[in-house]
Each structure stands twice: as structure tokens, then as C-alpha cells.
């Protein structure tokens, strides 16, 4: 199941390559969920979940997949490159503070995007070390 943070309005605790959030979250009786993917075929960072009561939107959440900093629902070399560029100062536009992408890049959740986050993603890509999504 996914974790819903009502303070930050983030949903996290999902895995890569999900076409839907079925089995991760469910709407309470009388409500429906509308999932809007940010890009591609998978639910990833920056995707949205609207909680609807009929035609009325009653809540709005943003999905965070730690390590997925481009929002395609896959943690791969593209994400690794974005963090690398951020750390060497050549591209800071996508990872501005407070954005869901910056949150996803801070995989160790210490409040900053650092070499430690870079190393965790590298370990995931090269050794299959899991990234904590909880």
C-alpha cells in the first residue's frame, strides 16, 4: 500500500513501472480517484491523484517515487544524470526547492540533494540496492 501524507499532500511508497495505483490506494465509499500521469505510461513523480466526490474535487495529492526525478515512473540513468547535473551546478531548473522532483531526488530525506542521494541511486542502478519508498 502507498503512504498518504496529508500534511505535504504527497503519496509515496509505490514501486516503479506502475500503470495504475490499483492495489496501492483505494477511495473511501462514495469517492473516486482520478490519477493523472505526468508523462509516459507509468505513474511517477509529479503524477497527480484527485479525490472526487461526484463532480467535486475534495483533495489533490502529488505522487513521489524516490529516485524518479524526471517523472516517467522509472528510476534510471536519466534520473541519475539529472541529479549529477544538479550537483555540479549545470542544471538546477528541474530540482527547485519544494518541487516534487526535488523531493524525489532527496532519496535519503535529509532535506538536501547531496552526493549521498547520488550514491544511493548509483547503488540502485549498479547493484540493485533498493531505494526506501516508505
Which residues does each PLM region occupy?
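Cellulosome-associated attachment modules in secreted, modular CAZymes
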Residues: 1-134
Amino acid at each position: 500500500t502507498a503512504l498518504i501524507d496529508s500534511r505535504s499532500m504527497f503519496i509515496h511508497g509505490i514501486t516503479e513501472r506502475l500503470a495504475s495505483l490499483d492495489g496501492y490506494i483505494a477511495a473511501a465509499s462514495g469517492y473516486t480517484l482520478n490519477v493523472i500521469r505526468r508523462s509516459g505510461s507509468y505513474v511517477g513523480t509529479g503524477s497527480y491523484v484527485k479525490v472526487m466526490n461526484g463532480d467535486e474535487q475534495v483533495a489533490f495529492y502529488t505522487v513521489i517515487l524516490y529516485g524518479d526525478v524526471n517523472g516517467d515512473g522509472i528510476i534510471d540513468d536519466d534520473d541519475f544524470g539529472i541529479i549529477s547535473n544538479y550537483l555540479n551546478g549545470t542544471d538546477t531548473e528541474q530540482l527547485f526547492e519544494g518541487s516534487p522532483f526535488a523531493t524525489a531526488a532527496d532519496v535519503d530525506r535529509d532535506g538536501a540533494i547531496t552526493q549521498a542521494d547520488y550514491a544511493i541511486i548509483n547503488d540502485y542502478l549498479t547493484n540493485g540496492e533498493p531505494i526506501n519508498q516508505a
